[in-house]
């Protein structure tokens, strides 16, 4: 075969020489994720986003991003089976300001509670907070042996199950309906709702392991920057610095479409 006739060899050589390896991380920026003021630890971590290029704005790629965080990390606590979902609602500088988006229990906690010889009682209810957030709350509880009981099973009768379920729904509705989202989250952190249900149902059938196992966000009111700033302790500067023990920058009080005025002289 004549020299220079092998097209595949020459083609491959040219292509290999031209190809440049571009590091994808060179086009990206790191943003800090900030939790609302209800939690002790405000610095959740960092998130990555592609830099602003033409009409594609970086902050638009961050808005609506959901972070799932263990309550132990948010409260510097030992109780790690409760997970909170936080959604990015606004970006101020290099900070992503988040808001409550849901709550869940870990799979291993749920599985550890389900056992033989007891009745599992579940209830769910859709409730609206005073500030217009529509939440769906799921509750779970388990029957337990009475103090002087000899029999190994502790099954509740169907009528008792219905009474307990009714009580669960009543308490969940009452606790959410009369409060705004901030107060509801403050009740979910120690799960005071579950303790109230356990106490109220004691007369029907003794319960244990009563938890609000899940909270879903169904509807939100129209986004207001002022309300988000309130949740973050007026711009998320002073409160965050105290809670996380590091400097998080100055107070931010700019509107969403803010543009600095044009200066005559530089």
From Swiss-Prot:
One of its GO terms (biological process) is chordate embryonic development. InterPro entries: Ribosomal_eS1, Ribosomal_eS1_CS, Ribosomal_eS1_euk. One of its GO terms (molecular function) is structural constituent of ribosome. One of its GO terms (cellular component) is cytosol. Residues 244-257 have a biased composition (Basic and acidic residues). The keyword Ribosomal protein applies. Its main location: cytoplasm. It is found in: Cytoplasm. It comes from the Eukaryota. The keyword Glycoprotein does not apply. Keywords: Cytoplasm, Ribonucleoprotein, Ribosomal protein. Residues 235-266 are annotated as: Disordered. Component of the small ribosomal subunit. The ribosome is a large ribonucleoprotein complex responsible for the synthesis of proteins in the cell. Belongs to the eukaryotic ribosomal protein eS1 family. Component of the small ribosomal subunit. Mature ribosomes consist of a small (40S) and a large (60S) subunit. The 40S subunit contains about 33 different proteins and 1 molecule of RNA (18S). The 60S subunit contains about 49 different proteins and 3 molecules of RNA (28S, 5.8S and 5S). This is Small ribosomal subunit protein eS1. The gene is rps3a.
């Amino acid at each position: 075969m004549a020299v220079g006739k092998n097209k595949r060899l020459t083609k491959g050589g040219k292509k290999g020489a031209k190809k440049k390896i571009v590091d994808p991380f060179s086009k990206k920026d790191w943003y800090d994720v900030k939790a609302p003021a209800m939690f002790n630890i405000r610095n959740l971590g960092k998130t990555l986003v592609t830099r602003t290029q033409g009409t594609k704005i970086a902050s638009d790629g961050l808005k609506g991003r959901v972070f799932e965080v263990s309550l132990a990390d948010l409260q510097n606590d030992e109780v790690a089976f409760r997970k909170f979902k936080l959604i990015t609602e606004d970006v101020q500088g290099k900070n992503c300001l988040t808001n409550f988006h849901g709550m869940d229990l870990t799979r291993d906690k749920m599985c550890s509670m389900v056992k033989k010889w007891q009745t599992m009682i579940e209830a769910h209810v859709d409730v609206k907070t005073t500030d217009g957030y529509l939440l769906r709350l799921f509750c779970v509880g388990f029957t337990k042996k009475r103090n002087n009981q000899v029999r190994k099973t502790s099954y509740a009768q169907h009528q008792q199950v219905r009474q307990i379920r009714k009580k669960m729904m009543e308490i969940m509705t009452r606790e959410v309906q009369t409060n705004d989202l901030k107060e509801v989250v403050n009740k979910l952190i120690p799960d005071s709702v579950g303790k109230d249900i356990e106490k109220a149902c004691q007369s029907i059938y003794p319960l244990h392991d009563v938890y609000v196992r899940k909270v879903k966000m169904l509807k939100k009111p129209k986004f207001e920057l002022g309300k988000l700033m309130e949740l973050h302790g007026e711009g998320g500067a002073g409160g965050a610095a105290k809670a996380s023990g590091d400097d998080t920058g100055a107070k931010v009080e700019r509107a969403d479409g803010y543009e600095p005025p044009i200066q005559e002289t530089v």
